[in-house]
Regions:
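Active-site cavity-forming subdomains of large catalytic enzyme subunits
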Residues: 1-138, 152
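Active-site helix-to-loop segments that bind/position phosphate- or nucleotide-bearing substrates
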Residues: 140-147
Length: 152
């Protein structure tokens, strides 16, 4: 998943890149939305885009115009999604390890910088005995699956 913060100077190009179906067609995109951006949208106010290299304001835009651009692009191409990183970080279970900066491609696993996400699944049909669940088999399978994920 490619995530760009809402205040990045290239945000408008990032938001609209998938309007061309030939661009990044096997890659998910999301915008990291901040509380400050949402507040600027509520007030229909300006919002600063900030150069990540020097921390200086590159320019101001109308927050609602950017939100409209995001919505139109999402309606047309299915992307970008929105990731509310400030909200996620308020619930960060390991803030001492760092701030969450991204998620896995589907967004269900918040990630610290440089973390990866290995997902697993279990075919529950394989633990059926007739129409009942074989709970002992499921327990063994879950333990094995967790072991595989822990060592991946």
């Amino acid at each position: 998943m490619g995530i760009l913060r809402v205040y990045h100077p290239d945000i408008e190009e990032f938001v609209t890149v998938k309007n061309d179906p030939r661009e990044l067609n096997n890659f998910n995109l999301s915008v990291a939305v901040t509380d400050a951006f949402i507040a600027a949208c509520r007030e229909d106010g300006p919002f600063s885009l900030v150069n990540p290299r020097n921390g200086r304001e590159a320019r101001k835009i109308r927050a609602l115009s950017l939100l409209d651009l995001i919505a139109r692009s999402a309606w047309g191409s299915g992307e970008p999604g929105l990731v509310f990183l400030d909200t996620i970080n308020r619930s960060n279970p390991t803030p001492h390890a760092g701030a969450i900066e991204a998620t896995n491609p589907c967004g269900e696993q918040p990630l610290l910088p440089y973390e990866s996400c290995c997902l697993g699944s279990i075919n529950l049909v394989k633990v059926l005995r007739g129409e009942a669940i074989d709970w002992e088999k499921l327990e063994r399978l879950v333990h094995l699956a967790v072991r595989f994920l822990d060592t991946s």
